[in-house]
Amino acid sequence: MSSSQDYNNNSNNTPARVSSRKGKNLHVAHRRSPSELTNLMVEQYNLQRQLEEVQAQQKLLEEKQKQQQQQFTYPSAQGSSELAPPPISSGYGGNRSSHSRSSSINTHRRTGSGSGGTAHGHSRRHSLGLNEAIKAAANQKQSNRNSLSPTIPNEAKTDSSDDIGSFKFPPSGGDQGDTSGQSSSSHNRSRSLAYGQQSFKFPPTPDQSNDTRGNSLLPPNPNFSVTQSPDRGHNRRSSHFRTGSRGSGSNTNTDGINSNWRAQQQSPQQQQRQGGLLEPPQVGFTPGHKPRNSSYGGGSSVSSLQQFLPNNGGSNNSGQQGGHQGGGNNGRKTLFAPYLPQSSLPELINEGRLVTGTLRVNKKNRSDAYVSTDGLLDADIFICGSKDRNRALEGDLVAVELLIVDEVWESKKEKEEKKRRKDNTLHSRPLTDDIHNDATSAPNTAEGSVTGTSKEDGAGSNEEETGGLARRGSLKQRPTMKKNDDVEVEGQSLLLVEEEEINDEIKPLYAGHVVAVVDRIPGQLFAGTLGLLRPAQAAQAARDKKNGKESTVQNPKAPKIVWFKPTDKKVPLIAIPTEQAPKDFVENHEKYADRLFVASIKRWPITSLHPFGTLVSNLGPIDSPETEIDSILRDNNFLCDEYPDDDNDDIVSVNAYDLPSIEPEFENTQREEYLNDYIIAFTQNGEFVDHALHVKRISNTKIELGFHVADIAYFIKPGSSLDRKSKKRSSSVFLPQKTVNLFPKQVNKIVSFKENEKNLAVSVVFEIDTSNFEVEDLYIHESVIVPKQLVTYDAFDTILSGQSVDSISSATSDYVKTFSLIAKEFRRHRLSNRSLGITPNLTLLDQLDDEKVRLDLNIFKDSLAFDVISEISHKVNSAIAAKVHAGLGDQAILRRHPLPTLQKMETFVRKATSLGFKIDTTTSSTLQNSILKIDDPVKRKCVETLLYKCMSRGRYYVAGKQDTDSYAHYYFNLPLYTHFTAPLRRYADLIVHRQLKAVLNKQVEDKDLDSLKAITDYCNFKKDCAANAQEQAIHLLLSQTINEMSETAGQLLCMGTVVQVYESSFDVFIPEFGVEKRVHGDQLPLVKAEFDKNERILELWWEKGVDSATYIPPDEKSSLSYRNSIKNKYRTSALQAAKIQSKTALEKSTTPADSVAEKLAKLNLEPPKLVVPSLKSNELHEVEKDETKSMPSSPTQSEIPKNVRTNSSSRISSSGNTFSLEPYLQNTITRIEGDSYIQVIKELTQVPVLLRAEIGMALPCLTVRVLNPFAEEQ
C-alpha cells in the first residue's frame, strides 16, 4: 500500500507517518464521526483531569493545615475525614471522589496513558506521520478516487494501548493497578469521554471567582510557557473576563439556552462544569456504521463527556458547582469538545501530532472552514462542520489534529443525505451535489446510486446524462433560504468570494478538526441587527402572518436573551442578555428592526450552539449615511475613539500631544543636510506629506536617487500616550466617504514635509549606474531636507500623461518624468523582464500588500503616479529590510507575502488554461509576466481576478519567529521586505523606523521576541481590517451610485465578460464598474440548462417571450424571499432600459446621473462610464462622458462551436425603432431547435447583463441577470 493509501484509507491499527513540505512528521488520526473523540483528545483530557485531581488534593491539605493552625489543636476524627483527600479511585455517581496518582504532577507526561498503561500504541485512534499525509494528498489529486475508505475492522485488543480507550476508573477502594485493569476490560467507545477543563487550563483554587475555564470564549495566552497562567490571555480583553459577582450557582435548573443564560453567568465555576452531567449518546448517533465492539466500539462521543469532568459532584466545591450536580444542569448536552490544555500544545505541535494555522470560514457554508498552515502543507486543511470547527472564529490561530480525509468526507456525505431527506428532496437532487456551492462542475457520469437521478424539480425535461454533458436537462435549484443567503454573500462584495470545489471527484487533500484556539485578537466588534427571535423563527412568523395563519412561533413574554445577527455572514448569531437591549425592546422589537447595533462576543459554552455576547452600542438607523460608515468602521474594529477631540480645532492645540521641539534637532551635526538639492515632496490625498524624492547626476555614468521619509520616530517616543493610542489604532483607514488617520490632525501637520522649510527626515540614497541601473552604493541616515515643491499624485498623473499643470514648474515636470524612467528600470529588474514599461500594471494584485489612499469606485483603476512611487518604494523598503535584519537579526520586523498553496496555484493554472492562456508558475516574476503579456485589458483583468483569489495578503513578522525559507515577499519577488515609507499611516513603519535608528546609532537592545510578535500580529489584524473596511465602503458607494443611475429604469443594462462557467450558473466581469458577479440559472426564465464540462459550455434553454428583467421566480413570492424584506423599486423591461440609456447618451439630457456626478465630485471621484454599444461599426456613446471607450473584443467566428450558429432572427429586433436591444445582442451565440430557444454561454465572450442594486439591507447588494435574447418586443 502506498503512503497515500495509508493516509486516506488506513484501516488497520498500525500508525503510519508522512512528512510535510518542511520535512516535519505529522500524525493523522482515525475517526468515524464528528462526535467521536480521537486518542489524542481522550489522552489529554484524562491527563488533565488527573492533574486537576492532584491539585485538588493539595488544596485540601493546605486547607487542613490552615485550619489546624487556627485551632491550635488537631481536628476530630470526623473533621479529619472530611478534610482528608478522597479515595484514590473515582466513580461516576453524583459525588465523585478525586482520583489520586502515585506519581507527581511533573511525571504526568502527555504521552502517558490515563490508566497507567504505556503511552504508545493506542489502538482506537492512530496517527499517521506527515510524510504519508503529503504523499497521500499528492496521490489523491492524481487518482480521483471515488471509493470510500474500507471499514475499519473490529478488534478486541487488550494490550496497554487500549487502556486509554475506556477511561473508566475502578470502584472506591481499588488501587491504581485495578484502575488500569478495569480500563482495559471495559474498552467501549459508547461510554462518554468527558473532561472538565473546558477552558483548557489547570484549575484555580475553589475560591477563585473569576475562573473562566468552562465557557470562556477567549483562548489562553498564546505564550506556550507552562509556568504562565492562561488567565493572562483573558487580561488582554477585560470585557470578556467573567467574574463570580452574580452569586452562587444554585439557580441553574433550567431547560435551555434562553432560560439558562443567567444561571450560566452566576458562577464561573459553574461554567467549567457546564458539560458536567451530559446525555448519553443516542442510538444511531453515527448513522451508516455497524455496531462496533472493537477499540472503535460505540464511539466515545463529545455529547457524553461526563466521566471526565473533574470534581463532578464533589462535595468540596458544592457551593460553586452545585448547579451542575445530579441534574442541576438539567442534562444539557455537550455540543463541542473542550479545548486541549494550552500547556500541552507546544509538545504536541513539535511532535507533529497537531498543526497550527489561521482559520478561514467558508462564507457560502459557514459551518465549514479551512485552516492555512503557512506553507507547512501544500493545501489548506478542510474543517467539516461546526462540531469540527469547535467555536473557532474567522482569523483565529488554531491547533488542528489531522484526520483521515475519506472518513471526514463520508461523514459529510451522511450529513448532507440527512439534510436532503429532511427537505424531501432526495428524489430530486443527486447526493454528490453541494447545495452550498452551485459553482460546481459535476462529474461527467453518474456512478452507482450515490448520484441519484439527474433531473431536478422543475427542470422541465426527462432527458438523461449523455456523453460529456453533466446533469443534462437539469437546472440546479437552490432552496429559497439558500438563494437569499447567496444574494447577501455574493452581493455584498465587489468580487466573488473564493470557493473550493469539493465533491467525490475532487476531495480535500487534508482534513482535520480544531482542538484548541491558540490565539485570538482581543476586543473584536461586530455590527448587526437585534431581534427577539432567531432568524429562522422570525422567518416562520413572517410566513404565518402573510398566509393569514395564527403564528406557530410565540414571542417569549420575558426572554432572558435576545438575538444579535451580525452583518458579517462569517460571524455566528450571538445571544445578548435582555437587560442590555433597549428598555422597550421586548414590547416594541419591530421598531428596532431597521437599526444597527454593535456587539462583541464574550464567551461560547460547549453546551451552546451560539456564543454569548455583550451589546456595545446602538449605532442608529440602517439607511443613515453616518450609520452606514460607522457600521463599517465598527465592524472592522475601528472605534475611532483614540482622539475624541481631534475634530475640534479650538480644543486641540499644537502642544496637546507633548511633541518635542524641532528647532534644536536642526542643529544636530549627526544629521545629513539636503538643503540645496531639488527635492520634490508628494502627497496622495493632500492631508499629509510623508515622502519626498530627489535625483541628480554625480558623473557621466552615475546618478543619485534619494528617497526621504518623515522622521516619525523623533516625534513619537516609545511608551508615550500618543504611542499607545496610535498603536491601538495601528493603521489609517481610507474610505471614499471618510478618512480615519493614524495620528491626530495636528501631529500630521507638524510631522509632514512643508514646502521651502526645513524638515526632519530619514533618507535612503542610492548611487545608480545608468548603463544597467544597478545600485552601486547605498547610504541611509537621519537628515534635514528642504523640499522645493509639493506635488499631488493628481498633478503627477497629469504630467505623465503629457499635459502641463499651471502650478508645477517645468523643472519639476522634468524631474517627475525622470522618476518615471528610473521606476521603469527598477521594475524591469525586479520582474526580470527587459521589455516591461511602467504600464500595464496588476492594480488589483498590488492591493494584496497595501490598501489604496487615493480611491476610485473601480478598484481596477490605475494611477501612474502611484505606480512610479510604489516601484521606488519597493526598492527602499527592500534596502531597509536588509539593513535592519543585518543589524538586529531575529528581532527585525519585516513583511512577507506567502506563496499560494500548491493546490490553489494548480487550480488557478487550470482555470487560466481553460480560458486559453499559458501561465508559467516557475517564479513570481514568470507568473506576473504571463499575465502582463495578455493584450486585451479586460481579459487580463479576468485572469488577474482569478489569481487574486488564490493569494493571501502580506503579513508582518518577527524574523526570529519565522522560518528563514518563508522570509520572502512572493508577489514583489523580493527576498526581504518591510514597510518603512509610509510612517504617517502605518504603525508598523514607526516600529521599523525605531529599529533602523537603533542600528544606525548602534544602540541595539535585546527585545522580547514574543512581545514583538504580539505587535506584528495586531498590526496584521488591523491592516486586514482597514482593507476590508475600504472594500466595503467602496461597495456601499458603488451600490448607491448604481441605484441612483438606474432610478428611472430600475436597473442598468451593460455588457459583461464571462469568466467561469458552471453547471447551472456562470460568472461575469463588468469592466465599467470593476465588479465580478454570478448569474444564477434559477433566477432566469429557463426551461433547462445543459453543461458540457469538456467543452466548458453552458447552454441556456429559454422560455420564449419572457423578459428576464421583470421575471420573478415563483419561490421569491413567498415570505422567505429576501425581496419581501426590502423596499423594492419599480423595474422596467429590458427594452425600456435600453431606450432610456440610449436616449440619455444621444440627448445628453439632465438625468439622475448628473446629481450622481456632483456627489462623487465632492468626494474627488469620477462617475462610472457606462458604454452603450451601437450596431457593428457605428460609434459607441457614453452616458456619462463624451469621450469614447471601446468595448472588449468580440469573439470571432472561429470561437463559435461548429454546431452553434449566430441567429438573431427570433430575438428582439429594432424593426424601425431608433432604440433597441439589437446592439447588446448582436454578438450573442444562439440557435433554435424546433420549439427550443437556446443561448450558448462560453468563457471570455460578452453577454448583456442587467445590473441592479438592492437597497434596504444592512449592506446593499449588487445582483445581475443575463438578458433573454428571445424575449418578445414590448
UniProtKB/Swiss-Prot annotation:
Protein's recorded name: Virulence protein SSD1
Q: Name one GO cellular component term.
A: nucleus
Task: Cite the record's Polar residues compositional bias ranges.
Answer: 72-81, 139-152, 248-263, 438-453, 1190-1207
The chain positions of domain CSD2 read 562-637
Q: List the disulfide bonds.
A: none
What is the organism field in this record? Candida albicans (strain SC5314 / ATCC MYA-2876) (Yeast)
Which protein family is named in the record? Answer: Belongs to the RNR ribonuclease family.
Name of the encoding gene: SSD1
Comp. bias (Basic and acidic residues): 413-437, 1178-1189
Question: Could you tell me what this protein does?
Answer: Plays a role in resistance to host antimicrobial peptides such as protamine, RP-1, or human beta-defensin-2; allowing colonization of human tissues. Required for resistance to membrane permeabilization and maintenance of mitochondrial membrane potential upon exposure to RP-1.
Q: What is one Pfam family matched by this protein? A: Dis3l2_C_term
Q: Where is the composition biased (Basic residues)?
A: 19-32
